[in-house]
Amino acid sequence: MAYRLLRALFRGLFRVTIDGVTDQFKHEKLIITPNHVSFLDGALLALFLPIKPVFAVYTSITDTWYMRWLKPYVDFVALDPTNPMAIKHLVRMVEQGRPVVIFPEGRITVTGSLMKIYDGAAFVAAKSGAAVVPIRLDGPEFTHFGRLQGVLKTRWFPKISIHVLPATTIPMPQAPRSRERRVLAGEHLHTIMMAARMATVPRETLFEALLSAQTRYGRFKPCIEDVSFKEDSYQTLLKKTLGVSRILQRFTVPGEHVGMLLPNATITAAAIFGASLRGRIPALLNYTSGAKGLQSAIIAASLKTIVTSRQFLEKGKLTHLPEQVNEVNWVYLEDLKDTVTLTDKLWILFHLCFPRRAMLPQQADDSALILFTSGSEGNPKGVVHSHASLLANVEQIRTIADFTPRDRFMSSLPLFHAFGLTVGLFTPLMTGSRVFLYPSPLHYRVVPELVYDRNCTVLFGTSTFLGNYARFAHPYDFARVRYVVAGAEKLAESTKQIWQDKFGIRILEGYGVTECAPVVAINVPMAAKVNTVGRILPGMEARLINVPGIAQGGRLQLRGPNIMRGYLRVENPGVLEQPSAENAQGELDANWYDTGDIVTLDEQGFCAIRGRVKRFAKLAGEMVSLESVEQLAISLSPEGQHAAAAKTDSAKGEALVLFTTDSEITRERLIKAARENGVPELAVPRDIRVVKALPLLGSGKPDFVTLGKMAQDPEMSV
């Protein structure tokens, strides 16, 4: 009777729903592993699961007064994590057919994300051979019974959902020692819990996700700031978004690709969300690519309109672009301010109260945004992402990293770069964190000062940018920073060392590609390994395809929710080319993406990048990584610029060419460095050319197309 009354009370107050595979609790041996978000979790499971399980509860909690009061109504067993016999007792209970609930995190979350996973529950599952049923609780964290007051917008009676995921098993790992087997089993359970989180993420559009974040963290919570030093709340950002959307619809149509040539600023964020909510697809243009790069993007994406700012063009010395690129309609934000009418203002006011009614009908799998590749190996390609792929990558990041609304992001990487967009804008907004948008990562003195002044805790950048920030920063500038993540290029040892020595901060290296929105793998404090880029993100499948001549590793191919919808190419304007990749049998598999990168995956799942397939040279039948040649030069001259290319050779098929700005680099010095680093002498170039500067793309990456032409033609210069 008491159970029925309490169940009715909870269902009435919290509108509790239970969904998923609810008929799988009949397994002979069963372990239930929920996430732990509040003190209500145990009561919810006891009341709403269709079975009466035993709860494994730590001894520190079983001795409290309320647990003694609950003992007559709920079966629980005291679990002492320091006593090995406690685990054996749980194994016996499971083997006897008692379903057991174990909270793998061992404590209520204080971040809103998954915390450390204890390996005890996993070892019990592996030892007993029990079915593991992960459960995802959503909603209790918003109550006053959670530990996220001041982090989330708490309320008395939020809606609570209990998601039951499909049962799985944890086979006993193969390892010589019991301790190692426990650790490996724990990592398997961690993977299961992360997959459960990803499986229950709602399918939304970008604008819907922004509204959900506003509801979750509070409409008046500050969320975004730029160089105007005016901090906007979710409500203010929504107001600007509605305003831009109202104006954009005057000269664009639903489904149109709309070019945006804008800096890192709040108005750019509003323009992206504003275009999206009215069914327009923003194409974020690289303002460093020059007129030729812009024209390629315009052709590939079939752009008719480019939205920009006169002030931005003047400050960036880009006023020549509208004159040189005259095949599109240029629209200036400054000119639009005076066109806002009373009707527009009333429309904005109404939809501030009912924002979802401003949206045109859209699906999560519809095209949401177009980014462009750097063009380092040919013409830039338009990369079309859906709402679902962008938001999936955000959730993948949030699943493995413990970002919270207390964090402050410094975002200086351009928003036209996938790294800057997803990690520097969408992730903080969807997490409730504050983000400071700065227009240039090249201001090496200003960025560290702003990190210090705005109390930033999260900083992302390339190895080059982070190395220069360290050179100019005061040792105290990064005192509050707890996450520094490097991506987009290989992390230099010198950069890693100066951050450790000067600031006491370990840089976490990650790996991504524009086609994957972009993060593919990343080291985090909970799972990091030196000389790797971390583990592949949850929800992604990875496979390695053998490449003839390369003994270690293979060509990385990926499939997952964050993969792009497809390419837009200059050669086939406006036509979406869906992703596919050749499998080991040479057959095309749809929805797989071939990164073109040679990587290794170790037994723990950590990924190490060896180089790009296109950046290998074949010398007398042996494959040599051009990046390994560059690393030799960097070891001799860390301050210089170095790039390797290949040229045709009648004797060996191909020969190496090293371009460097350091005239003191010689073949003899390179041979000595190769011997010291265990690099074969075959990887030491005979052709060393000193240049004043390397040819660079607008993104700052070397222009390998031009370098390849220079390698073939000794007379050609930058």
Curated annotation (Swiss-Prot):
InterPro entries reported for this sequence: Aas, AMP-bd_C, AMP-bd_C_sf, AMP-binding_CS, AMP-dep_synth/lig_dom, ANL_N_sf, Plipid/glycerol_acylTrfase
Region (AMP-binding) location: 233-646
Membrane topology of the entry: Multi-pass membrane protein
EC number of this enzyme: 2.3.1.40, 6.2.1.20
GO cellular component: plasma membrane
SMART domains in alphabetical order: PlsC (SM00563)
Function, in words: Plays a role in lysophospholipid acylation. Transfers fatty acids to the 1-position via an enzyme-bound acyl-ACP intermediate in the presence of ATP and magnesium. Its physiological function is to regenerate phosphatidylethanolamine from 2-acyl-glycero-3-phosphoethanolamine (2-acyl-GPE) formed by transacylation reactions or degradation by phospholipase A1.
Protein name according to UniProt: Bifunctional protein Aas
Encoding gene (name): aas
